[in-house]
Amino acid sequence: MSQFWNDKIKSISPYVPGEQPKDKKYIKLNTNENPYPPSPNVIKSVKSMDIESMRLYPDPDVTLLKDEIAKYFNLTREQIFVGNGSDEILAFIFMAFFNKQDKVYYPDITYSFYPVYSDLFDLTEVQIPLDSNFEIKIEDYFGLDGHIIITNPNAPTSIALTLDKIESIIVNNPNNLVVVDEAYVDFGAESAVKLVDKYSNLLVVQTFSKSRSYAGMRLGYALGNSNIIEGLERLKFSFNSYTINRISIESGIESFRDEEYFQECRRKIMNTRDYTTTELQKLGFNVLDSKSNFLFISHITANASDLYQKLRDNGILVRYFSKPKIDNFLRVTIGTDEEMQEFIAKLQKII
């Protein structure tokens, strides 16, 4: 601690990211990274990058990438915001649209950055309990007196709401901003992007990190009413005009252009997820219905914390949360077929 820390820094509990081990090589199933490389077109773009251009600032408006995203979703450039990963965009949302002491509603079991942002920006967080099946009861979100953030599919539970349920929440909160964080939407859920033109109080956030194998490059984007997007732009240009580097912009464009590769990777991950689910159930695991690139699992007899440590000792990293209600669950990222076969083989010896 330093004498120069302000009161907020002294009191805040920062977000704890998943382990990125440096001591030895593990099968990494703990941070929901894509097991496959980016599109070959992306790799080619990076390798052919004009090094001389690195001395120049990138386009602060990220125009070409916005245009590519807008074309993909049949929106306009003015409806797209691009940030340095979706986490940055979420932080910008908390800063741009929520006043101090505003209420912000989200599930009690969800992305753990939300409480950090609520604390950091002096908001009143209201955590709405999931039901006994770890599902969101949409009626709990009707007619609220504050803004709403929903991760869909939810994390770490992996369960998705249908689009009609998302729309019901939006319709029943006409004066509140409804943010739908869709980091994992490409693995079987239905995106709310198609509702963007219909509702001015909807903001959808997506990322390149999961389905586009871009976690190391840091790219995310938001889609919404042009007036909402303008608010994000005003904040960004009051904070840091150049949040996206040249390599990310140029290669990100190529990622959106290679639809065939994108769909192929999605299919492989979802097929491997189905295989892994079946094998885990044979071993006595309860596996929640996943629409994500990970599984949320608990065993009928084995303790989750013990399983986490035994798997780690056997060279496999998964994610364990000590939070009440989910402290006997593990979150397991879907890797390659070979990685998941090894994961199952280790569990067969451990259980």
Name each model-derived stretch.
Residues 270, 282-314:
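Conserved PLP-binding catalytic core of the aspartate aminotransferase-like
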Residues 1-56, 144:
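N-terminal "arm"/small-domain region of PLP-dependent enzymes with the aminotransferase-like
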Residues 201-281, 285-288:
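PLP-dependent aminotransferase class I/II
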Residues 131-186:
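Active-site phosphate-binding strand-loop segment of PLP-dependent enzymes
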Residues 96-151:
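PLP-dependent aminotransferase-like
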Residues 164, 310-314, 319, 323-351:
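PLP-dependent enzyme catalytic core of the Aspartate aminotransferase-like
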Residues 63-103, 301:
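Phosphate-binding glycine-rich loop
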